[in-house]
Amino acid sequence: MNKLKTDLNLIWNDICLELQKVISKEAIEKWFVPIELLSIENDQLLLKAPDPIYQYWIEENYLSQLIGASFRILAKNPKIIFAQESPGNGEKATGKKIKSLPREDKSSIFESKGLNTKFSFENFVVGPNSEFAAAAAKAVAESPAKAYNPLFLYGKVGLGKTHLMQAIGNHIVEKNKWILVQYVTSEQFTNEFIEAIQKGSIGQFRKKYRQIDVLLIDDIQFLAGKERSQEEFFHTFNCLFDGSKQIVLSGDEAPSSLQNLEKRLISRFEWGLTAEILPPGIEVRLAILKHKLKNYSLSIDEKILEFIAERIKTNVRQLEGALNRLCAYASIHKEGKITLEETQSLLKDLISLQPSKTITIEMIQKRVCEAYDIRFSDMVSKRRISAIALPRMVAMYLARRLTNLSLSQIGENFGGRDHGTVLHAQRTISEKMSKDPDLAQLIKKITEQLTSSQ
């Protein structure tokens, strides 16, 4: 073995050792040890793989880590080139992928990052209830760590928080597969943390979560009461944020309303942008059903879709589940046809969960007037009274959450105000709630009073 080859082998060994800081030892032995470093010329590392699958797998999963490790060893930012063997031509360098390479299912790349490719911005039905959150999510997906960091999405179960978080991750990976993205629930984060402590692999756990470019962590409220997990996530958050990495979180409440979480964590959740997703109005619920129906080769009467949309009001996941049940029954038993009576029978357990009476704007206005000790006539007047501004916005916000009326219809009930005023009120109160626990608690109390009386 000549000296040059020996030197190259030593350099490659150093690179592999450096890679162990960010990649498991098992992965190094499987994918990198069989690789041979042929040359280093003009800031290019020419590598030889024993089989095309090595090139494919490294390029798909570890290229950014390999470039980083090579930079730290060589003090230069190299381009990674794989040599191909061409019959009669010896080794030939190429920067292109081998066309004949059998590729694994595309979804496996996303699954390794905790992502499900069925969630996209294209199949997220946007309405007034979610347009601000959807716009913020798209901005983050287009420019990670430059638009809003962190982005905190909140709302009740089944309204689309997970869909938007997954869409962010999928969009980023589609645009640049080398960006390190990880979606995880806070429960998974906690379980991995506990397992790492038990196995003595806490260093590897920290490398996994502190070396990534985009962290999407769902259901952050699960960390409540878990002091050591909160401590670990606090330092993970700081490491990523200080490194200008994107953080997206979701919870069932605004940050200020989260219980049993450290104040220093809640404070960090509020550093960026908070965006609430509200229950969809009837127009959006109907649009969701029609969009979902496109996945089936069935034609269901619009009156049946309206029936479902009118009765399942607060949970998109439940709405979609009802349609799935209906379509399954129709395709198996009814040759694609189903009646309203059959729909009522099939969905009786879901429909029975819905409020039997409708909450009106007047009911909301009166409850808010009681809470703020103001006159009803001032609430609905056209006059601009500063003392009434906040209560009026609170009432508009609750009207968006608890009624099926459009923005314009709500505005009409507040002295003939336009839809833009209502939308502004919705966004303002949503933002205030994320930072004012007293306001968030008051709105929660009024909501409970209104819904429990139904």
UniProtKB/Swiss-Prot annotation:
Compartment(s): Cytoplasm
Major localisation: cytoplasm
Transmembrane segments: none
Residue segments, region Domain III, AAA+ region: 114-330
Record key words, sorted: ATP-binding, Cytoplasm, DNA replication, DNA-binding, Lipid-binding, Nucleotide-binding
Residue numbers spanned by region Domain II: 76-113
One annotated GO molecular function: ATP binding
Similarity comment: family membership: Belongs to the DnaA family.
UniProt remark on domains: Domain I is involved in oligomerization and binding regulators, domain II is flexibile and of varying length in different bacteria, domain III forms the AAA+ region, while domain IV binds dsDNA.
Protein's recorded name: Chromosomal replication initiator protein DnaA
Organism: Methylacidiphilum infernorum (isolate V4)
Organism placement in taxonomy: Bacteria, Pseudomonadati, Verrucomicrobiota, Methylacidiphilae, Methylacidiphilales
